[in-house]
Amino acid sequence: MSYSAADNLQDSFQRAMNFSGSPGAVSTSPTQSFMNTLPRRVSITKQPKALKPFSTGDMNILLLENVNATAIKIFKDQGYQVEFHKSSLPEDELIEKIKDVHAIGIRSKTRLTEKILQHARNLVCIGCFCIGTNQVDLKYAASKGIAVFNSPFSNSRSVAELVIGEIISLARQLGDRSIELHTGTWNKVAARCWEVRGKTLGIIGYGHIGSQLSVLAEAMGLHVLYYDIVTIMALGTARQVSTLDELLNKSDFVTLHVPATPETEKMLSAPQFAAMKDGAYVINASRGTVVDIPSLIQAVKANKIAGAALDVYPHEPAKNGEGSFNDELNSWTSELVSLPNIILTPHIGGSTEEAQSSIGIEVATALSKYINEGNSVGSVNFPEVSLKSLDYDQENTVRVLYIHRNVPGVLKTVNDILSDHNIEKQFSDSHGEIAYLMADISSVNQSEIKDIYEKLNQTSAKVSIRLLY
């Protein structure tokens, strides 16, 4: 069999078996007899074509807050220029740095506000190497054609395990006993120390973390209730309750796993603590705004709440250092640290080697796919658009990435510009005021790319344009 004949056979087989790569595609595995008919040098899967952007030189990536080395490797393997910093940057320095970068990677301490993003003249995308994205002005970023990606589940196991440890530690007052013995005090007591078996855990927010926590808790003999604003299938024997009050009334331990939104701000405050069981425990490893800490302090002082574990706070230090967690940062700090059976940790829920490595891979891969292919699946502020990767057989094919205001008539205008060429694939979607069109056009000569770019750049609804070829 000739090489070209094998290629034709491969293409025919891919079409017959529907190897489209699309999410809804159905395929079956080729039989071994078919595989044996192919020469060893022929691959069933075509090699994706490495695309390069028109009118852009080296891709510059700025990584802050000690983003994991797995991300650095992925970016450098792509040939990107990477600038790495272990901590966040002061606002004025960040404004200067962001002027010339195409992508920026941050964690939870860097704030990408409208003031900062106004200076991001080349920025294509933002990677939040964490779950939360409230540190980024998502709406403004979208209005400038900047896609934002995060890691919604890579640290789920690490956070869930931390909460399990805190449940046991609170029930046995391990924090207080450890502090006492560190200072030379031997205090062997059993009063108000409990097994967790048979107790009820109430989970507020049954997402990636809440559901994993549910499974781990049941394995230790806890009964699990959960409250969520949407109906979610329970894992194991966990049971969803219809109101937050019902969960609070019935739970021995209450743990929060919700995002920071206007609806979740001070989700647990004085009325909610009053609704809880006497001697219940509170755990917050989600966002610092969801628990009203002054009200929690009063509930602990009144012996209504027997203890709490907090990993997040309304205001957190910008960097590690002695004395940085103080009353200047949060006015109630001294009062909180003086209370018994209070476990305080410095936002370490996802701080494990495994989680950070996984987050680095997940977010860096998403950013690379968006930069290299225009794939926006997983973006938190942007339409989710994807097309199959181009391959090396498509020599004169250009991928058009056109971000525009979501107004009538845009597709007609764009397709009129592209009509001199064959539009092989096209996908468009919208997200609020922003829409995103991705199209592959063939039979494009190198000399025509600039003309296409300039015509698209003159359209009135344009937010940003990239051409990959």
Swiss-Prot record:
Q: Where is the active site?
A: R287, E316, H347 (proton donor)
Q: Where is the ACT domain?
A: 399-469
Mind telling me what this protein is named? D-3-phosphoglycerate dehydrogenase 2
List the catalytic activities from the record: (2R)-3-phosphoglycerate + NAD(+) = 3-phosphooxypyruvate + NADH + H(+); (R)-2-hydroxyglutarate + NAD(+) = 2-oxoglutarate + NADH + H(+)
Biological or metabolic pathway of the protein = Amino-acid biosynthesis; L-serine biosynthesis; L-serine from 3-phospho-D-glycerate: step 1/3
Does the keyword field hold Secreted?
A: no
Which residues are listed for NAD(+) binding in this entry?
A: H208, I209, D228, A285, S286, R287, D311, H347, I348, G349, G350
- What's this protein's function? Catalyzes the reversible oxidation of 3-phospho-D-glycerate to 3-phosphonooxypyruvate, the first step of the phosphorylated L-serine biosynthesis pathway. Also catalyzes the reversible oxidation of 2-hydroxyglutarate to 2-oxoglutarate.
Record-listed N-acetylserine modification sites: S2
- What is its EC class? oxidoreductase
Where does the source fall among the domains of life?
Eukaryota
Kindly give the PROSITE patterns that the UniProt entry links to this protein: ACT, D_2_HYDROXYACID_DH_1, D_2_HYDROXYACID_DH_2, D_2_HYDROXYACID_DH_3
> Does the record's keyword annotation contain Lipoprotein?
no
Q: Which GO terms describe its molecular function?
A: alpha-ketoglutarate reductase activity; identical protein binding; NAD binding; phosphoglycerate dehydrogenase activity
Give the Enzyme Commission number. 1.1.1.95, 1.1.1.399
Q: Which UniProt keywords apply?
A: Acetylation, Amino-acid biosynthesis, NAD, Oxidoreductase, Phosphoprotein, Serine biosynthesis
Gene Ontology biological-process annotations: L-serine biosynthetic process
> What Gene Ontology cellular-component terms does the record carry?
cytoplasm
Alphabetical list of Pfam families matching this protein:
2-Hacid_dh (PF00389), 2-Hacid_dh_C (PF02826)
